[in-house]
Regions:
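Alpha-helical DNA-contacting segments of helix-turn-helix folds
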Residues: 58-65, 72, 110
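A short, Lys/Arg-enriched amphipathic alpha-helix from helix-turn-helix/homeodomain DNA-binding modules
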Residues: 12-21, 67, 71-74, 90
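Basic, helix-initiating cap at the start of DNA-binding domains
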Residues: 1-26, 31-42, 56, 80
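Amphipathic alpha-helical segments used for helix-helix packing
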Residues: 98-121
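Hydrophobic alpha-helical connector segments
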Residues: 60, 75-102
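Short hydrophobic/aromatic patch on the recognition helix
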Residues: 41-51
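Amphipathic alpha-helical packing segments from all-alpha helical-bundle domains
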Residues: 67, 71, 117-132
Length: 132
């Protein structure tokens, strides 16, 4: 990946993380695009290079955070030596529950904003999830 692509990815990740922090702190409704770009230290135009609006950002953030969670669970499963399928299912379920217990903000954000349609749209189009 070139320097330009690295810079783009860094800016997008900065916007995503800043939005997540604000959405979980202030709430989605009380957070503005201006709040996000000001805290991220980026120009408003940069925001619109990556997202149509705050709702588009939220949808992509849901897919991104859910994808991260499942990717992390998959990596942990790969590292564990588990003999059968049922035990694997229990392991992944326990992993996700423990992660939600340790990261209340993530659970709150996903539970308030995740609808199957939003997740399917974001994952189905491959937006953001495949850009990791």
């Amino acid at each position: 990946m070139g320097k330009v692509e690295d810079n783009k990815k860094l800016k997008m990740n900065t916007l995503l993380q800043t939005a997540f922090d604000l959405f979980t702190g202030k709430g989605f409704a009380k957070t503005t695009v201006s709040d996000i770009v000001n805290q991220a230290g980026l120009a408003k135009g940069t925001f619109y290079l990556y997202f149509k609006d705050k709702y588009d950002l939220r949808d992509k953030l849901i897919a991104f955070k859910a994808s991260q969670l499942f990717d992390d669970a998959h990596k942990a499963l790969d590292a564990a030596v588990i003999p059968d399928f049922e035990e694997e299912i229990l392991f992944v379920t326990d992993y996700i529950i423990e992660r939600f217990q340790n990261q209340q903000g993530l659970m709150k954000f996903l539970s308030k904003n995740l609808s199957w349609g939003v997740f399917q749209d974001a994952v189905g189009t491959g937006s953001l999830v495949s850009q990791k």
